[in-house]
Amino acid sequence: MLLLPSAADGQGTAITHALTSASTLCQVEPVGRWFEAFVKRRNRNASASFQELEDKKELSEESEDEELQLEEFPMLKTLDPKDWKNQDHYAVLGLGHVRYKATQRQIKAAHKAMVLKHHPDKRKAAGEPIKEGDNDYFTCITKAYEMLSDPVKRRAFNSVDPTFDNSVPSKSEAKDNFFEVFSPVFERNSRWSNKKNVPKLGDMNSSFEDVDAFYSFWYNFDSWREFSYLDEEEKEKAECRDERRWIEKQNRATRAQRKKEEMNRIRTLVDNAYSCDPRIKKFKEEEKAKKEAEKKAKADAKRKEQEAKEKQRQAELEAARLAKEKEEEEVRQQALLAKKEKDIQKKAIKKERQKLRNLCKTWNHFSDSEAERVKMMEEVEKLCDRLELSSLQCLNETLTSSTKEVGKAALEKQIEEINEQIRKEKEEAEARMRQASKNAEKSAGGGGNGSKHWSEDDLQLLIKAVNLFPAGTNSRWEVIANYMNIHSSSGVKRTAKDVIGKAKSLQKLDPHQKDDINKKAFDKFKKEHGVVPQADNATPSERFEGPCTDFTPWTTEEQKLLEQALKTYPVNTPERWEKIAEAVPGRTKKDCMKRYKELVEMVKAKKAAQEQVLNASRGKK
């Protein structure tokens, strides 16, 4: 709506009425090309610029149609209208050089041109002979236009285009010129793809992603090509519904078979290209080199890790070795310190013992007669063996600082305490031995050995034989029984059954009872090998300090040290036994020699017992 401008300042607006005739209402109809363009845009809901582009496109297509040159088909007039299905429809319309690329406008224009040229009326007017009805070749032009103007029928004909090359290059053909051979093949087969933007084959410079995308596309190729045009039977010609269904079934089966053959052809094409593609070989070599590099890097990393672990292990071993050496050094120092303390203790005890003997000798052993003196000397030796260092020091201090009567009283008191202690120990040992014997007899009841008495000597001999013939000895218990029968002083003959029963009863004893048995055996040994007192009329000899024979039983550790020393110092070694005694702490040369003789006797007895059992078994056989 148009409005007049307002009046200027200081001026007014005047309204005038023109003296004209009355208005009349008339109808106006819009016409012209601009109105036509407006209506098209309104109907298509498009802008003016979009419509302008459409117009340009139509103009370009019209210009192409005007520039299109139709090819003359020389065999057109010789075509049989009844065999129209086997004709080349594009060639009939003069589009043989354009074929599937021809647009609908071009097909329409070509048909129009062919009609103007070959219509029967026009040819008849020109004096040419005309066949009646559908027998004229013009029918072929009509059929060609019917097939190509219908998109469905045209697609069916394009699928079986007689000019299309369905051949697949072999591997030998593309060995040297792969891209020149396969590029046009993939290019012409790309027309069957349902998907647009079909990837190109590329060249040697194509990336792995492009090549992979290309082969992925063709291995999953989606083709629209179908073969309904080659149906042998037309369902429209069927006389009934059943016949039509049968025809459709036959046509579907034939189409499926041809579709399968087509997909096999495409797959063969892709397989041949893939096997001949030099880029695939290059990518495989690169992948192989990459994997080898990764494998080498992994191996290097593993080797470095192993080297680090080995280095750490060696460091740990070195640290453990140093710690062990340090610990061994500490143990050795402690052992040396303990040995020094023990030596100091021994020297102190030895000194106190000698002091006690000298003090008693000074007081003439507090006796007036020789018999009392000898007895007192034995008691003093007993004190020296039984008393500890502190008791010896206290007794020596008392004897040094007191008179003869006080010293004698102190000495006699100490002797009385020691004798009382020995008596109690002896009674306890005898009681334990009696109890052990009773327990052994009870546990061995029914074992065949209850009626045979086992003396202390036989028990010690049994223990010795069990240690002498360890487990694993052939006919062990027979050998032990034979050994006891040979060396026993009781005269009682033992069988293997008796020995087994007694050995089991001894194993059931508590540790205190075993200690009592061993101690009693040691006391007996000491008694048998002890010093015999001289006669009363004999002159007492002067006592000299020297190494005395140690009657303490040999421990397992001392036995190992002795065996090692015997191996270390052979028979031809000078001062052999002195060196062996030095290698066994706490043992003298005499102790080592005596122990060696005992071992030799034990080995001989063991061999003799084994030989006797062996001879007895041979005699039975």
From Swiss-Prot:
It comes from the Eukaryota. The modification N-acetylmethionine is found at residue 1. PANTHER family: DNAJ HOMOLOG SUBFAMILY C MEMBER 2. The keyword ATP-binding does not apply. Residues 449-511, 549-604 form the SANT domain. Residues 160-250 are annotated as: ZRF1-UBD. Residues 88-161 form the J domain. GO terms for molecular function: chromatin binding; histone binding; Hsp70 protein binding; ribosome binding; ubiquitin-modified histone reader activity. One of its GO terms (cellular component) is cytosol. It holds the Pfam family RAC_head. Residues 294-315, 426-453 are annotated as: Disordered. Component of ribosome-associated complex (RAC), a heterodimer composed of Hsp70/DnaK-type chaperone HSPA14 and Hsp40/DnaJ-type chaperone DNAJC2. Interacts (via ZRF1-UBD region) with ID1. It is found in: Nucleus; Cytoplasm, Cytosol. The modification Phosphoserine is found at residues 47, 49, 60, 63, 183. It comes from Bos taurus (Bovine). This is DnaJ homolog subfamily C member 2. The ZRF1-UBD region specifically recognizes and binds H2AK119ub. The ZRF1-UBD region is also involved in protein-protein interactions with other proteins, suggesting that it may be masked by some regulator, thereby preventing its association with H2AK119ub. GO terms for biological process: 'de novo' cotranslational protein folding; positive regulation of DNA-templated transcription; regulation of translational fidelity. Signal peptide: none annotated. Phosphorylated in M (mitotic) phase. InterPro entries: DnaJ_domain (IPR001623), DnaJ_domain_CS (IPR018253), Homeodomain-like_sf (IPR009057), J_dom_sf (IPR036869), Myb_dom (IPR017930), RAC_head (IPR032003), RAC_head_sf (IPR042569), SANT/Myb (IPR001005). Acts both as a chaperone in the cytosol and as a chromatin regulator in the nucleus. When cytosolic, acts as a molecular chaperone: component of the ribosome-associated complex (RAC), a complex involved in folding or maintaining nascent polypeptides in a folding-competent state. In the RAC complex, stimulates the ATPase activity of the ribosome-associated pool of Hsp70-type chaperones HSPA14 that bind to the nascent polypeptide chain. Keywords: Acetylation, Activator, Chaperone, Chromatin regulator, Cytoplasm, Nucleus, Phosphoprotein, Repeat, Transcription, Transcription regulation.
